[in-house]
Amino acid sequence: MTEVFLPSFNTGNFSKGAGIIKQTLWYFANALFVLASWNPFMGIKIFFLRLFGAKIGKGLVIKNNVNIKFPWKLTLGNHVWLGENAWIDNLDEVIIGNNVCISQGALLLTGNHDYTLSTFNYRNAPIIIEDGAWIGAKTVVCPGVKVKSHAILTVG
Protein backbone atom coordinates (compact mmCIF):
# COMPACT_ATOMS: atom_id res chain seq x y z
CA MET A 1 0.00 0.00 0.00
CA THR A 2 1.18 3.51 -0.81
CA GLU A 3 2.15 5.69 2.12
CA VAL A 4 0.11 8.87 2.32
CA PHE A 5 2.20 12.04 2.36
CA LEU A 6 -0.18 14.89 3.23
CA PRO A 7 2.10 17.78 2.14
CA SER A 8 1.66 16.45 -1.42
CA PHE A 9 -2.18 16.63 -1.20
CA ASN A 10 -3.70 17.20 -4.61
CA THR A 11 -7.30 18.22 -5.29
CA GLY A 12 -7.15 16.41 -8.63
CA ASN A 13 -9.92 17.57 -10.97
CA PHE A 14 -12.12 18.86 -8.12
CA SER A 15 -13.92 22.14 -8.77
CA LYS A 16 -15.81 24.12 -6.15
CA GLY A 17 -18.10 25.24 -8.96
CA ALA A 18 -17.91 28.96 -8.18
CA GLY A 19 -15.35 31.74 -8.11
CA ILE A 20 -13.68 33.00 -4.96
CA ILE A 21 -15.97 36.05 -4.68
CA LYS A 22 -19.14 33.94 -4.79
CA GLN A 23 -17.64 31.48 -2.30
CA THR A 24 -16.71 34.28 0.09
CA LEU A 25 -20.11 35.95 -0.16
CA TRP A 26 -21.78 32.58 0.48
CA TYR A 27 -19.57 31.99 3.52
CA PHE A 28 -20.87 35.19 5.14
CA ALA A 29 -24.50 34.82 3.99
CA ASN A 30 -24.52 31.26 5.30
CA ALA A 31 -23.01 32.24 8.65
CA LEU A 32 -25.31 35.23 9.14
CA PHE A 33 -28.63 33.97 7.79
CA VAL A 34 -28.81 30.26 6.90
CA LEU A 35 -26.67 28.45 9.46
CA ALA A 36 -27.40 31.02 12.17
CA SER A 37 -29.41 29.66 15.09
CA TRP A 38 -30.93 33.11 15.78
CA ASN A 39 -32.81 33.12 12.45
CA PRO A 40 -36.11 31.20 12.61
CA PHE A 41 -37.36 32.68 9.32
CA MET A 42 -37.31 30.01 6.62
CA GLY A 43 -38.10 32.54 3.89
CA ILE A 44 -34.81 34.36 4.48
CA LYS A 45 -32.86 31.09 4.40
CA ILE A 46 -34.59 30.01 1.18
CA PHE A 47 -33.96 33.43 -0.39
CA PHE A 48 -30.20 33.17 0.21
CA LEU A 49 -30.01 29.54 -0.90
CA ARG A 50 -31.73 30.42 -4.18
CA LEU A 51 -29.65 33.58 -4.58
CA PHE A 52 -26.52 31.42 -4.48
CA GLY A 53 -27.84 28.88 -6.99
CA ALA A 54 -29.76 26.20 -5.10
CA LYS A 55 -32.69 24.80 -7.05
CA ILE A 56 -35.54 24.58 -4.54
CA GLY A 57 -39.10 23.36 -5.03
CA LYS A 58 -42.07 24.60 -3.02
CA GLY A 59 -42.68 23.91 0.66
CA LEU A 60 -39.10 23.62 1.94
CA VAL A 61 -38.86 23.37 5.73
CA ILE A 62 -35.34 24.27 6.87
CA LYS A 63 -34.66 24.28 10.60
CA ASN A 64 -31.84 25.99 12.51
CA ASN A 65 -28.16 25.17 12.14
CA VAL A 66 -28.48 23.49 8.74
CA ASN A 67 -25.10 23.72 7.01
CA ILE A 68 -24.88 23.62 3.22
CA LYS A 69 -21.39 23.84 1.77
CA PHE A 70 -22.14 24.80 -1.84
CA PRO A 71 -25.78 25.75 -2.60
CA TRP A 72 -24.99 25.91 -6.32
CA LYS A 73 -24.54 22.11 -6.18
CA LEU A 74 -27.90 21.46 -4.48
CA THR A 75 -31.31 20.52 -5.91
CA LEU A 76 -34.29 20.12 -3.56
CA GLY A 77 -37.71 18.87 -4.66
CA ASN A 78 -41.08 19.90 -3.26
CA HIS A 79 -41.86 19.59 0.46
CA VAL A 80 -38.36 18.70 1.65
CA TRP A 81 -37.62 18.88 5.37
CA LEU A 82 -34.10 19.67 6.59
CA GLY A 83 -33.83 19.07 10.34
CA GLU A 84 -31.71 20.85 12.94
CA ASN A 85 -27.96 20.42 12.54
CA ALA A 86 -28.23 18.59 9.22
CA TRP A 87 -25.07 19.02 7.17
CA ILE A 88 -24.99 18.81 3.40
CA ASP A 89 -21.27 18.63 2.67
CA ASN A 90 -21.74 18.75 -1.09
CA LEU A 91 -18.38 18.81 -2.81
CA ASP A 92 -20.38 17.12 -5.58
CA GLU A 93 -24.05 17.38 -6.59
CA VAL A 94 -26.79 16.52 -4.10
CA ILE A 95 -30.22 15.91 -5.58
CA ILE A 96 -33.12 15.41 -3.18
CA GLY A 97 -36.56 14.43 -4.49
CA ASN A 98 -40.05 15.37 -3.32
CA ASN A 99 -41.37 14.69 0.19
CA VAL A 100 -37.97 13.77 1.61
CA CYS A 101 -37.11 14.18 5.29
CA ILE A 102 -33.48 14.76 6.27
CA SER A 103 -33.63 14.45 10.07
CA GLN A 104 -31.64 16.16 12.81
CA GLY A 105 -27.89 15.81 12.61
CA ALA A 106 -27.90 13.82 9.37
CA LEU A 107 -24.75 14.15 7.26
CA LEU A 108 -24.78 13.98 3.47
CA LEU A 109 -21.14 13.55 2.56
CA THR A 110 -20.23 13.66 -1.14
CA GLY A 111 -16.47 13.70 -0.68
CA ASN A 112 -13.72 11.53 0.66
CA HIS A 113 -10.05 10.86 -0.07
CA ASP A 114 -8.22 8.20 -2.02
CA TYR A 115 -5.98 6.64 0.61
CA THR A 116 -4.26 4.50 -2.07
CA LEU A 117 -2.51 7.58 -3.47
CA SER A 118 0.32 9.36 -1.68
CA THR A 119 -1.32 12.65 -2.75
CA PHE A 120 -4.57 11.72 -0.87
CA ASN A 121 -6.68 13.11 -3.76
CA TYR A 122 -10.39 13.75 -3.36
CA ARG A 123 -12.77 10.93 -4.31
CA ASN A 124 -16.11 12.66 -4.74
CA ALA A 125 -19.43 11.38 -6.06
CA PRO A 126 -22.99 12.75 -6.10
CA ILE A 127 -25.78 11.74 -3.73
CA ILE A 128 -29.29 11.18 -5.06
CA ILE A 129 -32.22 10.78 -2.68
CA GLU A 130 -35.43 9.79 -4.44
CA ASP A 131 -39.00 10.80 -3.57
CA GLY A 132 -40.44 9.91 -0.18
CA ALA A 133 -37.19 8.78 1.44
CA TRP A 134 -36.41 9.42 5.09
CA ILE A 135 -32.85 9.94 6.31
CA GLY A 136 -32.99 9.35 10.07
CA ALA A 137 -31.34 11.41 12.79
CA LYS A 138 -27.51 11.26 12.85
CA THR A 139 -27.43 9.08 9.73
CA VAL A 140 -24.46 9.43 7.37
CA VAL A 141 -25.03 9.14 3.62
CA CYS A 142 -21.74 8.52 1.81
CA PRO A 143 -20.46 9.60 -1.62
CA GLY A 144 -22.12 7.94 -4.60
CA VAL A 145 -25.16 6.65 -2.70
CA LYS A 146 -28.55 6.56 -4.40
CA VAL A 147 -31.37 6.29 -1.85
CA LYS A 148 -34.33 4.68 -3.59
CA SER A 149 -37.90 5.95 -3.43
CA HIS A 150 -39.51 5.66 0.02
CA ALA A 151 -36.42 4.06 1.57
CA ILE A 152 -35.55 4.65 5.21
CA LEU A 153 -31.93 5.04 6.35
CA THR A 154 -31.25 5.00 10.09
CA VAL A 155 -28.33 4.63 12.46
CA GLY A 156 -28.01 1.35 14.24
Segment roles from a protein language model:
Residues 58, 63-64, 69-70, 77-78, ...:
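Left-handed beta-helix
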Residues 1-21, 62-85:
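Short, charged N-terminal helix-start/capping segments
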Residues 120-122:
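Extended, positively charged loop/linker patches that create polyanion-binding surfaces
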Residues 115-118:
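A short acidic, helix-capping loop that chelates divalent metal ions and anchors anionic groups
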Residues 1-54, 58, 132:
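Terminal amphipathic alpha-helical/low-complexity segments used for targeting or macromolecular assembly
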